[in-house]
Regions:
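Conserved alpha/beta-hydrolase "nucleophile elbow" surrounding the catalytic nucleophile
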Residues: 25, 92, 96-101
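Active-site loop/oxyanion-hole signature of alpha/beta-hydrolase fold enzymes
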Residues: 36, 42-46, 53-93
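Flexible "cap/lid" loop of the alpha/beta hydrolase fold
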Residues: 102-110, 116-145
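Active-site nucleophile elbow and catalytic-triad environment of alpha/beta-hydrolase enzymes
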Residues: 169-185, 200-202
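Short beta-strand/loop motif that positions the catalytic acidic residue
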Residues: 189, 195-197
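Short alpha-helix in the alpha/beta-hydrolase fold that links the catalytic acid
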Residues: 204-212
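Catalytic histidine-centered segment of alpha/beta-hydrolase-like enzymes
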Residues: 225-237
Length: 259
């Protein structure tokens, strides 16, 4: 339970005495969908890691408020801290994708003593959902027809296709996340960071810019992947596990052998 009374669902895997990796999913996804069904949990536990996967507020089995004020980026970063405190974890490694990467950027800046290194997948600078048309989205869920804006329609269609998603909560999250500090080249965390973005993702150059501005950033281009299918990439998983283990990661996944 968070300080503002929100129940945040967590999932624990592996040996609790091993070093911990925290997994935080993307927009409209869930801990199990983003990480367990895609092989991440299996591979991390197989590498001897203790894994905590989080359903972010508004997602999965966590509470789904319809109040945008519940979803400031600082609040989502604080949820990560609450989970660390609940599990009595002094220091962890972090893996986040898309929304989870943006939250990880903020959490790494706010709590550098708790997050030793982070994998930030599919992260651009700023807020990638600035163009999301809130009123068109609300009209859609009220039965008023599909959004005219293509980006808004794409995200709503994707979210609606995932069981148990609450579209009103997700729209509130988009609105609430517009408040507060966003990732920029001027506010990079100082921990070692692995930036991983699909070669076919439109945000790839913005991800590269964030990496270049990070004191200890490494960039990994996920071959043949876009923003939506990058999390299932075996090359991405292999690069992330290598990075977390302190093994140098090549700039491209072309030479990585899948597991």
């Amino acid at each position: 339970m968070t300080a503002d009374g929100v129940a945040v669902a967590t999932y624990e895997f592996g040996d609790p005495d091993a070093s911990t990796v925290v997994l935080v999913h993307g927009f409209a996804s869930s801990a199990l969908g983003n990480w367990n069904l895609t092989g991440w949990v299996r591979d991390l536990v197989g590498a001897g890691r203790h894994v905590i996967a989080i359903d972010q507020r508004g997602h999965g089995a966590s509470d789904k408020s319809h109040d945008p004020a519940s979803y400031a980026i600082q609040t989502l970063a604080d949820d990560v801290l609450t989970v660390l405190d609940t599990f009595l974890l002094d220091e962890v490694q972090y893996v986040g994708y898309s929304l989870g990467a943006r939250v990880g950027w903020k959490a790494a800046r706010e709590y550098p003593e708790r997050i030793s290194k982070a994998v930030l997948g599919g992260i651009p600078d700023g807020d990638p959902l600035t163009r999301f048309e809130l009123e068109q989205a609300r009209r859609f869920i009220d039965g008023g027809g599909p959004p005219d804006d293509g980006l808004t329609a794409t995200y709503l269609t994707m979210a609606a296709g995932i069981p148990n998603n609450d579209l009103s909560a997700l729209i509130s999250l988009v609105e609430g996340m517009r408040n507060g500090e966003q990732p920029t080249v001027a506010n990079a965390p100082r921990q070692p960071l692995l930036f991983a973005t699909g070669s076919d993702d439109r945000i790839i150059e913005r991800s590269r810019a964030l990496c270049a501005a990070s004191p200890h950033g490494t960039f990994f281009e996920i071959p043949g992947r876009n923003h939506f299918n990058a999390p299932v990439s075996r090359e991405f998983r292999a690069a992330a596990l290598a990075f977390l283990a302190g093994v140098p990661v090549k700039a491209s996944g072309a030479d990585s052998s899948p597991e």
